[in-house]
Swiss-Prot record:
InterPro entries linked: ACD (IPR028631), TPP1/Est3 (IPR019437)
Modified positions (Phosphoserine) in chain numbering: 25, 349
Gene Ontology biological process terms, A to Z: embryonic limb morphogenesis; establishment of protein localization to telomere; intracellular protein transport; negative regulation of telomere maintenance via telomerase; positive regulation of telomere maintenance; protection from non-homologous end joining at telomere; protein localization to chromosome, telomeric region; regulation of establishment of protein localization to telomere
Function noted in UniProt: Component of the shelterin complex (telosome) that is involved in the regulation of telomere length and protection. Shelterin associates with arrays of double-stranded TTAGGG repeats added by telomerase and protects chromosome ends. Without its protective activity, telomeres are no longer hidden from the DNA damage surveillance and chromosome ends are inappropriately processed by DNA repair pathways. Promotes binding of POT1 to single-stranded telomeric DNA. Modulates the inhibitory effects of POT1 on telomere elongation.
GO molecular function: DNA polymerase binding; protein-containing complex binding; telomerase inhibitor activity; telomeric DNA binding
Region Disordered, residue ranges: 265-368, 387-406
The name this protein goes by in its record: Adrenocortical dysplasia protein homolog
Classification lineage: Eukaryota, Metazoa, Chordata, Craniata, Vertebrata
Pfam families: TPP1 (PF10341)
Gene: ACD
Covalent crosslink: Glycyl lysine isopeptide (Lys-Gly) (interchain with G-Cter in SUMO2): 381
Span of the annotated motif PWI: 11-13
Principal cellular location given in the protein's record: nucleus
Length: 458
């Protein structure tokens, strides 16, 4: 206050809000605007927490900053000025002496922003009037905004601790309503939550997944290769007769070259060894006992020979391997006949393979032989009966019916009952088309084969 008696305004609102000054002495301010008069305070809206105790809302300035002041009804009743009955309307520009006031924080609610305001409990309206100057609000100051964020965070933390029913959705609603002070609310929300980063779940093992799928019954996984007979095993089983399936020697491991082989049964008439000019090897059957020879030839050998081979006068050689070790050819070689089972051992000859010197090449002229070609994959009931001579029938004994194996090679039991196949597998099987060569062979086989009659050598 100057010595001439004029009341001079000095800044005090910002310092009071920041806490650097205490409201111990009266503060002088200028009434810039009447936001809500005392007459409309009862029915009109108000930004104060309790509208029943608010008498008027004024905008007061200290010459540097402005602040919103809520004058209580008690303050209106105790104060006195000449135009009190008309309210604060028409008193803009006059000076106010705030004798008792306090700083409060308005939380954002109902579209109103969060801000600091002063609650005036006792004041005096001076007759001095000065020209009004527009000044910025104190809540726009950076230091005041920082202090406001701290106060909001403290207020929300206290309300959260005191009221356990405050949910996260309510906090988000408050953040949505108060876009201006969203940063402080975000910091408060992060402090209320436990942010530990992404949670990496432990990897689920195969056995854990199988255990979760099991519903009271044991679940086992068996490879399909153990439940199905491979093509090589099926080829070997189909190439053997009923007797050899139960009493024959143990077969070697399957060879991939067997996939293109066919079974050819050749019945040749008896002939003397001297007619060919080539001595017989040891282990071969004599002319009286040789009635049937079995040879596994490549499927390509059944086709027509090359033109260069057609000019040759020699017929197709009959390949038969002896179980014993063969010795070099000599005129003193033993000619002891062996049993039919020892001499007629199936031999595997891959395609385009030249017979070795240890194999017997029968070059003697023979009569046309009757051949039955059997392809792998046909059921046993569609196969033509094998030709048998009298000597072979007398030598062989009746064999028992072949029974399917009970266990796999690894000792696991066979499973002959399966669930119905899936729809996709049925569709794939129905979409398979047979090759024309197989269809032609099947038609020829059905039209020419006579199961009731037994072929005779020509």
């Amino acid at each position: 206050m100057a010595g001439s008696g004029r009341l001079v305004l000095r800044p005090w609102i910002r310092e009071l809000i920041l806490g650097s000054e205490t409201p111990s002495s009266p503060r002088a301010g200028q009434l810039l605007e009447v936001l809500q008069d005392a007459e409309a305070a009862v029915a009109g809206p108000s930004h104060a927490p309790d509208t029943s105790d608010v008498g008027a809302t004024l905008l007061v300035s200290d010459g540097t900053h402005s602040v919103r002041c809520l004058v209580t009804r008690e303050a209106l009743d105790t104060s006195d000025w000449e135009e009190k009955e008309f309210g604060f309307r028409g008193t803009e520009g006059r000076l106010l002496l705030l004798q008792d006031c306090g700083v409060h924080v308005q939380v954002a609610e109902g579209g109103a922003p969060a801000e600091f305001y002063l609650q005036v409990d006792r004041f005096s309206l001076l007759p001095t009037e000065q020209p009004r100057l527009r000044v910025p609000g104190c809540n726009q100051d950076l230091d005041v905004q920082k202090k406001l964020y701290d106060c909001l965070e403290e207020h929300l933390s206290e309300s959260t601790s005191s009221n356990a029913g405050l949910s996260l959705s309510q906090l988000l609603d408050e953040m949505r309503e108060d876009q201006e002070h969203q940063g402080a609310l975000v910091c408060l929300a992060e402090s209320c939550l436990t942010l530990e980063g992404p949670c990496t779940a432990p990897p689920v093992t195969h056995w854990a997944a199988s255990r979760c799928k099991a519903t009271g019954e044991a679940v086992y996984t068996v490879p399909s290769s153990m439940l199905c007979i491979s093509e090589n095993d099926q080829l070997i089983l189909s190439s053997l007769g009923p007797c050899q399936r139960t009493q024959g020697p143990e077969l070697p491991p399957p060879d991939p070259a067997l996939q293109d082989l066919s079974l050819t049964l050749i019945a040749s008439p008896p002939s003397s060894p001297s007619s060919s000019g080539t001595p017989a090897l040891p282990g071969h059957m004599s002319s009286e006992e040789s009635g049937t020879s079995i040879s596994l030839l490549p499927a390509l050998s059944l086709a027509a020979p090359d033109p260069g081979q057609r000019s040759s006068s020699q017929p197709s050689p009959a390949i038969c391997s002896a179980p014993a070790t063969l010795t070099p050819r000599s005129p003193h070689a033993s000619r002891t006949p062996s049993s039919p089972l020892q001499s007629c051992t199936p031999s595997l000859s891959p395609r385009s393979h030249v017979p070795s010197p240890h194999q017997a090449l029968v070059t003697r002229p023979q009569k046309p032989s009757l051949e039955f070609k059997e392809f792998v994959g046909l059921p046993c009931k569609n196969r033509p009966p094998f030709p048998r001579t009298g000597a072979t029938r007398g030598a062989q004994e009746p064999c028992s019916v072949w029974e399917p194996p009970k266990r796999h090679r690894d000792g696991s039991a066979f499973q002959y009952e399966y669930e119905p196949p899936c729809t996709s597998l049925c569709a794939r099987v129905q979409a398979v088309r047979l090759p024309p060569q197989l269809m032609a062979w099947a038609l020829h086989f059905l039209m020419d084969a006579q199961p009731g009659s037994e072929p005779t050598p020509m």
